[in-house]
Amino acid sequence: MSIGILGKKLGMSQFFDEQGRAVPVTLIEAGPCRITQLKSSDTDGYAAVQIGFGDTREKLINKPAKGHLNKTGETLLRHLREYRVDGLDGFELGGSITVGDFEAGQKVDVSGDTIGRGFSGYQKRHGFSRGPMTHGSKNHREPGSIGPGTTPGRIYPGKRMAGRYGGKKITTRGLTILKVDSERNLLVVKGSVPGKPGALLNIRPALRVGAKPAKGGQ
């Protein structure tokens, strides 16, 4: 049973299917993730499993975190995530979540931070058309009008303007696992996922699986 796993994006490649077609894929180094805490309905009000992933230096972990991780015998975990479950059967404190809990053909949702591009202009951030490049034009990459004048005398909230681009957490849903390599802790996922190589990813079983129902259908 797969509840979710943390991993690191390695990069993109291509995978050839049975028909010989090249399919773009993302390679993810996922787990093994140590189970660091079990929450039950009796003590916490809900059932959940907390896992840890990634190595770090000892001086970067404070004393409360060390005390929390000492219960599992592992003190140098960088990232902690929690997954809600219906019951705690099959989970043990100090156990591991591995890619073996997933299977080829399974649909997953992958969450991560998009690539940060810093302060960007209108064309790069929002895809605005640029102004004429001919002689006499002075608004090559300017935004143009950003609103009326005296009425309302202000810029409406949410107006698309230049600003920080990227660096936001998003979720790519319904990706298909093409291959599971338990020996090398690799997941081969069809398509692209957020972030650049080395970025932290949260892989969970897809919330929505199946074709979109037709209009008027059940």
Swiss-Prot record:
What SUPFAM superfamilies does the database record attribute to this sequence?
Translation proteins (SSF50447)
Q: Which GO terms describe its molecular function?
A: rRNA binding; structural constituent of ribosome
Under PROSITE patterns, the record lists: RIBOSOMAL_L3
UniProt record similarity statement: Belongs to the universal ribosomal protein uL3 family.
Please give the HAMAP family that the UniProt record associates with this protein: Ribosomal_uL3_B
UniProt cross-references to NCBIfam families, sorted A to Z: L3_bact (TIGR03625)
What protein name does the entry list? Large ribosomal subunit protein uL3
Q: What is the organism field in this record?
A: Parasynechococcus marenigrum (strain WH8102)
- What is this organism's lineage? Bacteria, Bacillati, Cyanobacteriota, Cyanophyceae, Synechococcales
What is this protein's gene name? rplC
